[in-house]
Design a protein with these regions (language model features):
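Positively charged n-region of N-terminal signal peptides that target proteins for export
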Residues: 1-4
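Surface-exposed, polar helix/loop patches in the mature regions of secreted/periplasmic/lumenal proteins
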Residues: 94-152
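N-terminal glycine/threonine-rich, aromatic-flanked beta-hairpin/loop signature
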Residues: 61-110, 184
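A broad, structure-centric signal for solvent-exposed, well-ordered loop/edge residues
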Residues: 8, 57, 79-81
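Bacterial N-terminal signal peptides
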Residues: 6-15
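Short, hydrophobic/aromatic-rich segments at coil-to-beta transitions
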Residues: 44-51, 82-88, 118-122
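Disulfide-bonded cysteine motifs in exported proteins
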Residues: 14, 44-45, 71-74, 103, ...
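Amphipathic/hydrophobic helical signal segments and adjacent flexible N-terminal regions
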Residues: 19-67, 128-130, 138-201
């Protein structure tokens, strides 16, 4: 099942992409990254939503791109008992030549990307060796999603029957997504209490 096992997913993503894990991240730089990602200082639970719908012109210029639309919801939740902040992501997208909505999710931590002048990113992984993504800020209004492979599930279908892998290709390695109102990402949330909280942000 989708959440049946827990693996060291962030560590695996860090290894694949030649990055240093959270222990090596400067706290001040991580705080500055969070302010850019979430559009301000963190509260007890803070969200950021990014959306992109690729138009015909873009897809014509990227004929090998498999994805036609993408939504990203990033969450930061204060965990005072652990004296830390827990980060997670939910990713929803549509395939270009396949019907349906597909989702993935997992946990994240700060990493330092090598050969980028010490750029801070979030390294995010999916349980059970499901791959993952890296998140960076392009500017104040846009984020970049980098992936090699990420497991996803067709929405509202049994896990065992609906598992897929989105594998990076020539036009599917880096996606730019643009900041949007939180309601744009509400479809990615399944918990009723969290959905209600999101709608009141």
């Amino acid at each position: 099942m989708k959440y049946a096992c827990v693996a060291a997913v962030v560590a695996s993503i860090v290894g694949v992409h030649s990055c240093h894990a959270q222990e090596a991240v400067d706290k001040a730089k991580a705080t500055a990254f969070d302010a850019r990602m979430f559009g301000g200082p963190l509260s007890q639970k803070t969200y950021a939503c990014f959306v992109r719908r690729y138009d015909a012109s873009h897809l014509a210029q990227h004929p090998k791109q498999k994805v036609s639309a993408m939504k990203l919801l990033v969450t930061a939740e204060d965990a005072p008992e652990d004296k830390t902040v827990n980060y997670s992501f939910r990713l929803g997208f549509k395939y270009r030549h396949r019907a349906g909505n597909f989702d993935s999710s997992g946990f994240c931590s700060h990493i330092v990307a090598e050969n980028t002048g010490g750029e801070i990113r979030l390294g995010c992984g999916v349980d059970c060796e499901g791959g993952g993504i890296q998140l960076a800020m392009k500017d104040e209004k846009s984020a970049l999603i980098r992936l090699e492979r990420i497991r996803n599930w067709e929405r509202n279908k049994p896990d065992d029957d609906a598992s897929n892998d989105l594998v990076a290709g020539a036009d599917d390695k880096i996606f730019r997504v643009d900041r949007a109102d939180l309601h744009e990402c509400s479809e990615l949330v399944t918990d009723r209490k969290e959905l209600a909280a999101l709608r009141h942000k």
